[in-house]
Amino acid sequence: VEKVIPGSAAEKAGLQKGDRIVKVGSQEIDVWHTFTSFVSNNPNVPLELSVDRAGHIISLSMTPEVRQQSGGRKVGFAGVELRIVPLADEYKIVQQYGPFSAMYQAGDKTWQLMRLTVSMIGKLIVGDVKINNLSGPISIAKGAGVSADSGLVYYLMFLALISVNLGIINLIPLPVLDGGHLLFLFIEKIKGGPVSERVQDFSYRIGAMILVLLMGLALFNDFSRF
C-alpha cells in the first residue's frame, strides 16, 4: 500500500502506508488485481484482510464503500493506492530501435496519447468521468517528480504526455484558445465576413470565465488530494 485516502473504507479499517495485503478471507493475494476484484465485487460487504505490517501478520475488517458507475452498476471502493515495486534487472527487457523505427514508434505513441486525451475530454463532458478527477499544476508537479525519480526516459514520457494534453486542449473551440480562433475563421469562411467585434468580445469574456472556473476547480481538486 502506497497511500490510504483519508476517510475511505481502508482508513476506517486501519490500513496504513507500507502494509502488504496477503489474504482476503481465505484467498491469497499474489497480484494486486485479485484484491481490487474482491473489493469491486463486494460493495458494502465486510471483508476480512490478513495484512503483513513490518513482518507481523495482523487481521483487519474492511467494508468497501459503494460507488455507482455511469451504467448504474454498483461497485466497491477501498481507497488505497498501490506501491509500484521496480522489477529486478533479470526481468527487464530492453528493446532498441533504429532512427526510422524510433520515429514511427514515437508517432504511434503520440497518436495513442491524442486519442486517449480526446476520449477523456469526451467522458468528462458526458459525465462518465467525474469532474473531481481533473488535475492542476500541483498534481502535474507531483507527477513530474515521481517520473523523474523513475528515470530520464519516464520523465521525458511524462513531458510528452503533458505536451500532447495541452495541445489537444488548446484546440477545443473555446474563445481565448487557438481552437476558438479557428472556429471564428471557420465561421468567417462560411458567412463571407468576419464575426462582429461585439460577438467576439462577448465570446472571449465567456471563454475566459470558463477557463478560470476550470483552473479553480483543478486547483481545488489538487488541494483536496494533498
Swiss-Prot record:
Annotated Gene3D superfamilies: 2.30.42.10
EC number: 3.4.24.-
Keyword line: Cell inner membrane, Cell membrane, Hydrolase, Membrane, Metalloprotease, Protease, Transmembrane, Transmembrane helix, Zinc
Enzyme class: hydrolase
Domain of life of the source: Bacteria
Written domain comment of the UniProt record: The 2 circularly premutated PDZ domains act to negatively regulate protease action on intact RseA.
Annotated protein name in UniProt: Protease RseP
